Amino acid sequence: MMKVKLNSKIFLFLFFIVALPTFLFSQQSYDITFKIGEIYVDTVVIKSYYGNKTIVIDSLKREKDGSFRLKKDNIHKGIGIFTVGKMDIFTFVFDKENKFEINLDDNWNYLVKGCQENDLYFEFQKANKQIRFLESKTKREIKQNPNANKDSLNNIYNTEVNKFMSFQKEFYKSYPNHIMTKMVKALEDPQIPKEYLNGNQIDTTKKLEFIYYFRTHYWDNFDFSDNRLIATPYFFTKQKTYMNELTMQTSDSIAVAIKDFIEKANQNNGIEYSKYILDYYILMNRKLPFAYNEERFVEIVDRVVSGERTPWISPSEIETMKAEADKIRPLLPEKQFINISEKTLNGKTYNLYDIKTKYTVVYFWSAGCESCKINLDQLETFYKKYKRVYDVEIFSIDLDNNMEESIAFQQKHPFDWIVLKSNSTQLKEKYNLDIEMTPDLYLLDKDKKIINHTPLYNQIEETIRSIEEEE
């Protein structure tokens, strides 16, 4: 029996490993020199965005002339980050021009040699920062000085805003393929047809139709054929809004949203985006043993994964995913749990279906598992306090392969609930039940249908409380 304490860092590392192959798109070699004013450090780090992450590209040592030089192959085109310690100093562009120099003086003025793409990028960033600074300054002056001439301050601000808007418009027109233009355009919402408006407001009688239209056309301004955008912070920001705010947080709705996204991306030469979003949500849900993650994983595999829609996944990999979904399917919420019949260390047999309480907690644990011991302590407190209040029974099975350790632990901790002895091999052979890690808990209703599945005791208590409060 594998004894595992869930660790989010391990999960993130696993995702990083799986996501890396998508970097094979849009890569290039670069030779970049950075000359950075009065930054007295010997080492800096160059990172880049990719989806929801920042990826370390290289650690650079200070050259004899005080500069830092990045010379590296296979860097994804997009936005790079110059980092000192834990502080991101500035961002820059990885694009077609691959040999250039970026100078930053003590007054934070940028001078770029040999790269118009970055020269334009810094020009745009400078104008953007100036208008944001003026906005903050204007609001602060109005707030701090009640006697300030608000009209005058607002007029000054509005004049500068109009100048910036003109600058933006000219920039987008002159440089339609610049990454800055593509990033800003990518975040634009779809235009609202007049049929959904009542004056300047959304017509409340057509609100549902409008929401459907908005979600359906949400990606219209995103250029899926431009793989640079996945290596910017803009893509994941937009994707997060699409999945978390424009999509109902039910398993089937999430799967449909992913399917729709992939179909749109595929139709517009955006297979890298399709791979990313599927990798992200498949891995997020398949590695976490919670009921809602398992439901989502099964729905995504059923609705999204297919040879036609996901051609980058081999037939054997698809078969593996489908088999994994089929293994999880019988243990999803509202499914009937298996009638387990096992013995105590003293040889007495207990059947799960003989328990007639309103709730049953089926708890798989191991005597040598430290996380299990924490859950056991919490369960014991909960059981003593709420056994009669909530009409709940605990049906626990120790899966430790070390019989002596199990005997010693149970003698030291004589629990009041049912404690049975088995092992993972026996459960697999008798019930086709795979318990891959402990602790593992299932909350069942009076008919032994699954309500929740989790490795965390507190979620069991929260679920029961929530049900009781609704009744």
Residue ranges: model-predicted function:
Residues 81, 436-440, 446-471:
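Non-catalytic, surface beta->alpha helical segment in thiol-disulfide oxidoreductase systems
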Residues 27-176, 183-187, 191-221, 225:
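A non-transmembrane, solvent-exposed segment enriched in polar/low-complexity residues
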Residues 350-379, 393-395:
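Short active-site neighborhood of thiol/selenol oxidoreductases, capturing the structured segment around
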